[in-house]
Structure formats: C-alpha cells, structure tokens
UniProtKB/Swiss-Prot annotation:
Keywords annotated in UniProt: Flavoprotein, FMN, Oxidoreductase, Pyridoxine biosynthesis
Name the UniProt record assigns to this protein: Pyridoxine/pyridoxamine 5'-phosphate oxidase
Source organism (scientific name): Actinobacillus pleuropneumoniae serotype 3 (strain JL03)
Pathway: Cofactor metabolism; pyridoxal 5'-phosphate salvage; pyridoxal 5'-phosphate from pyridoxamine 5'-phosphate: step 1/1; Cofactor metabolism; pyridoxal 5'-phosphate salvage; pyridoxal 5'-phosphate from pyridoxine 5'-phosphate: step 1/1
Catalytic activity: pyridoxamine 5'-phosphate + O2 + H2O = pyridoxal 5'-phosphate + H2O2 + NH4(+); pyridoxine 5'-phosphate + O2 = pyridoxal 5'-phosphate + H2O2
Gene name, Swiss-Prot/TrEMBL: pdxH
Length: 209
C-alpha cells in the first residue's frame, strides 16, 4: 500500500511562545476548552503509553480530570497497563485534535489516586458501567462474548441498585515533568513549545520542528 501522497498542509493557527501561559497546566486547560468548543471528536481521548518488561505498549483512554497536580484517568489496576505502571511508574500521554491541527504530549511519573477519590468517581458512573467494571477481567482471554454477558448479568442480579467499586479498579494521576504543545504550520515548519519541570519550576522553550 503506497501512502506517500497522503498529506495535509496545516495553516489554521500559530503558537507564540510569548502568548503561552507560564504554567503548562493552564495552557493545556485553554487548549482543551478550545477543542471542546470546536466540537473536536472525543476531545478528552488520549493515548497512554507505558512500558512492560522493557517493551512499550499504548492504548486510548479518556482523561477524567485535570488539576494543578496533573492528569487523572481510571482503569482496571489488574490490566496490562496496571501491570506496566506497577513495574515502571512512568507514562506518556498524547492528545491529538485534528480539527485544530494541534497535539499535546505529556511525560511524567504516575501514581494511584486515593480510594476516596476513586469511590466518588465510580459512584458517578452509569449503572451499566459500574456492572461492567466487575464483569471484565481486563486484558484476560475470554472463551467468548457470551461469557462476559453472563458474568455481567450475574453482577447485575447481585447488585440491582448499588454497585460498590471493585478493589482492583480506580484512578491514576500522571504528575507531569515535561509537556509539549504542537501546532501544525505550513511547509512542516510546525510550532513546538516545550515546558520542562526543573527543581519545581517550569521552564518554557521553543523546539525545532
């Protein structure tokens, strides 16, 4: 399959270092709000990359909170990503908003959030999603789809109203050490503004595309 001629020339906006926030979290929040306003497809979807047994692995996960400390998502702690994080507590996140010709890359240490925070979020989920968290042994082999459906039915019968949070399910927060903002520009002369955390302070610099 020849893909050589598939390309786009980006020209919608430019990214000025002088106009970027001093705090990259604030810059991210601004860009995320603009992606939501522009009705970008799945604006909170991000690629989460981890390393397990020395090999990189990645998957798409939804961002559920951004705060001054970092970026929060929820998952099954016994999944492959959970195993990778247990073994190597660092992750890289990538957001891509094609509608705005923008991308954000985030790298940092990752740790579990408190059980209380996970409980609050789990309680806010739809009933069927809470049932699914119990029914799915994420990343494990199934004999067939019917096995999963039957298990979900058993969980629903056991918990017709209140579904408690499984102990193996909860949130992680990525504590950023490096955040890069990418804005597509004509002739592949893209804008790249990178923030690095050095001794507790953010340093901002422009990178060559």
């Amino acid at each position: 399959m020849d893909l050589h001629n598939i390309r786009e020339d980006y020209s919608k906006q430019e990214l000025s270092q002088a106009h970027c926030h001093a705090d990259p979290i604030q810059q991210f929040e601004q860009w995320l709000e603009e992606a939501i306003t522009a009705k970008a497809n799945e604006p909170t979807a991000m690629n989460v990359a981890t390393v397990l047994d020395g090999k990189p692995t990645s998957r798409i996960v939804l961002l559920k909170e951004v705060n001054p400390n970092g970026f929060v998502f929820f998952t099954n702690y016994q999944s492959r990503k959970g195993q990778a994080i247990e073994q190597n507590p660092y992750a890289a996140l990538t957001f891509f908003w094609a509608e705005l010709e923008r991308s954000v890359r985030i790298e940092g240490r990752i740790e579990k959030i408190s059980a209380e925070e996970s409980d609050r979020y789990f309680a806010s989920r739809p009933y069927t999603s809470r049932v699914g968290a119990w029914a799915s042994n994420q990343s494990q082999v199934l004999s067939g789809k019917s096995e999963l459906v039957a298990k979900a039915a058993l969980i629903a019968a056991k918990h017709p109203l209140h579904v408690p949070r499984p102990p193996h399910w909860g949130g992680y927060i990525v504590l950023p050490e490096r955040i890069e903002f990418w804005q597509g520009r004509p002739s592949r002369l893209h804008d790249r503004i990178c923030y690095r955390l050095v001794e507790g302070k953010w340093h901002k610099e422009r990178l060559s595309p």
